[in-house]
Amino acid sequence: MLRTFMHAKLHKARVTEANLHYVGSITIDEDLLDAVGILENEKVQVTNNQNGARIETYAIKGARGSGVICLNGAAARHFQIGDEVIIMAYAQLTNEEIATHVPKVAVLDQENSIKQMLSQEIAHTIL
């Protein structure tokens, strides 16, 4: 049996662009993708801490070191520049893989630079 677990998370990212007329997806600084192991075209879930919106889309690479977080296409209607978001990717794991699974979590600052890397999420933690 496979179970679905979070494998990567960009926490407290800030939206830098919203492009309604792009075909779709979310553009993410390639350095951030690499830091947590999200691949180009991988399915991601994006939640908006300002308005509660939650969407699923796929990641595309943005310029390295740019800090870009750009919601493209219809998602641009739910995300504004400056909104704080959480970007998560999931993996399907076997029971054997679950025992050793460690998600990668990057906590970002207001410029979308990595402030802290976590190997686990601690219950009731406020960052």
Swiss-Prot record:
Is synthesized initially as an inactive proenzyme, which is activated by self-cleavage at a specific serine bond to produce a beta-subunit with a hydroxyl group at its C-terminus and an alpha-subunit with a pyruvoyl group at its N-terminus. The active site is at S25 (schiff-base intermediate with substrate), Y58 (proton donor). Pfam families: Asp_decarbox. SUPFAM superfamilies: ADC-like (SSF50692). It is found in: Cytoplasm. The keyword Lyase applies. Its EC number is 4.1.1.11. Pathway: Cofactor biosynthesis; (R)-pantothenate biosynthesis; beta-alanine from L-aspartate: step 1/1. One of its GO terms (cellular component) is cytosol. Binds 1 pyruvoyl group covalently per subunit. Its cofactor is pyruvate. It is an enzyme of class 4 (lyase). One of its GO terms (molecular function) is aspartate 1-decarboxylase activity. Substrate binds at T57, G73, A74, A75. The modification Pyruvic acid (Ser) is found at S25. Gene3D superfamilies: 2.40.40.20. InterPro entries: Asp_de-COase-like_dom_sf (IPR009010), Asp_decarbox (IPR003190). It catalyses: L-aspartate + H(+) = beta-alanine + CO2. Keywords: Autocatalytic cleavage, Cytoplasm, Decarboxylase, Lyase, Pantothenate biosynthesis, Pyruvate, Schiff base, Zymogen. One of its GO terms (biological process) is pantothenate biosynthetic process. Belongs to the PanD family. Heterooctamer of four alpha and four beta subunits. Catalyzes the pyruvoyl-dependent decarboxylation of aspartate to produce beta-alanine. This is Aspartate 1-decarboxylase. It comes from Exiguobacterium sibiricum (strain DSM 17290 / CCUG 55495 / CIP 109462 / JCM 13490 / 255-15). The gene is panD.
